[in-house]
Amino acid sequence: MDIKSEVLAIIDDLFMEDVSSMMDEDLFDAGVLDSMGTVELIVELESHFNIDIPIAEFGRNDWNTANKIVAGVTELCNA
C-alpha cells in the first residue's frame, strides 16, 4: 500500500469518512477534523509511519486537506 492509500485509510478508520473524493477540500470546514481529531490523527500517523510530526508543522492551514496531509507525511517519511 502506498502512503496516500495508507493516510486515507487512517482518516477513514479514525473519522469514518472517506475523503478520497475531496482531496483538496478543507477537512476542518467539512467537519472531518477538529482540534481533538487533529491530535488523534497526529498520534496515529506518527505511530503508523514511525515519524515525528513537529506540532509547529501541523498548522491548520498547512495540513487542512487530504492532499496536504499526504504530502506532509511523504516528506517526513523521506527525510
Curated annotation (Swiss-Prot):
<dbReference type="InterPro" id="IPR009081">
    <property type="entry name" value="PP-bd_ACP"/>
</dbReference>
<dbReference type="GO" id="GO:0005737">
    <property type="term" value="C:cytoplasm"/>
</dbReference>
<keyword id="KW-0961">Cell wall biogenesis/degradation</keyword>
<dbReference type="GO" id="GO:0036370">
    <property type="term" value="F:D-alanyl carrier activity"/>
</dbReference>
<feature type="modified residue" description="O-(pantetheine 4'-phosphoryl)serine">
    <location>
        <position position="35"/>
    </location>
</feature>
<dbReference type="GO" id="GO:0071555">
    <property type="term" value="P:cell wall organization"/>
</dbReference>
<dbReference type="InterPro" id="IPR003230">
    <property type="entry name" value="DltC"/>
</dbReference>
<comment type="similarity">
    <text>Belongs to the DltC family.</text>
</comment>
<comment type="function">
    <text>Carrier protein involved in the D-alanylation of lipoteichoic acid (LTA). The loading of thioester-linked D-alanine onto DltC is catalyzed by D-alanine--D-alanyl carrier protein ligase DltA. The DltC-carried D-alanyl group is further transferred to cell membrane phosphatidylglycerol (PG) by forming an ester bond, probably catalyzed by DltD. D-alanylation of LTA plays an important role in modulating the properties of the cell wall in Gram-positive bacteria, influencing the net charge of the cell wall.</text>
</comment>
<keyword id="KW-0597">Phosphoprotein</keyword>
<dbReference type="GO" id="GO:0070395">
    <property type="term" value="P:lipoteichoic acid biosynthetic process"/>
</dbReference>
<dbReference type="Pfam" id="PF00550">
    <property type="entry name" value="PP-binding"/>
</dbReference>
<dbReference type="InterPro" id="IPR036736">
    <property type="entry name" value="ACP-like_sf"/>
</dbReference>
<protein>
    <recommendedName>
        <fullName>D-alanyl carrier protein</fullName>
    </recommendedName>
</protein>
<feature type="domain" description="Carrier">
    <location>
        <begin position="1"/>
        <end position="77"/>
    </location>
</feature>
<comment type="pathway">
    <text>Cell wall biogenesis; lipoteichoic acid biosynthesis.</text>
</comment>
<keyword id="KW-0963">Cytoplasm</keyword>
<keyword id="KW-0596">Phosphopantetheine</keyword>
